[in-house]
Amino acid sequence: TYNLGPLLVDAFIRTESGFDPVATSSVDARGLMQMTEETFLWLRSKIAADEDLAFADLYDPDTSIRFGCYYLHLCLERYNGDVATAAAAYHSGWGTVDNLLRMEEHSADGQTLQGFPYSQMNHYVNKITSCYGAYQRIYAGN
C-alpha cells in the first residue's frame, strides 16, 4: 500500500501495537498503527471524505493499515524517504520534527535528523529502525 514495503509496515505495526488490532494507547491512539483522532480526521478528509468512517473504525485492521500506511507514506515523502526521520514524525508530529530540523545540533542538512533529543522519540525511532533492520536481515533473499 502506497509503495511501502511490507517489512517496514510490519515494523511500524509491531512497534505501535504489537499486532493487537484493538490496542488503545494512553493518548487514545487506536488500532494496529495507533492513530489519534485528530490525525484520523485529517487523513479521512484526504482519502475517505465520501466514506462513513468513524474513529472507532481504526480497530478494523484493514482501516488501520490503510490510514496508517497513508500517513507513513506522507511522512516518508515529506522527509525525503529517511525512515528514522519519518518515524520520528509519525510518532511526534511534523511540527516537532520540522522544529528540530531547523536546529543545527539536530540536523546538518535541515532535511534529516542526526539524533533524537527526546527520550520517547529516541526510544521509538530506535525500536522502528531495529525492528525494520531485523526483518530485512531475516527475510534477505526471500
Annotated model-derived regions:
Residues 1-142:
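Catalytic glycan-binding domains that act on GlcNAc-containing polysaccharides
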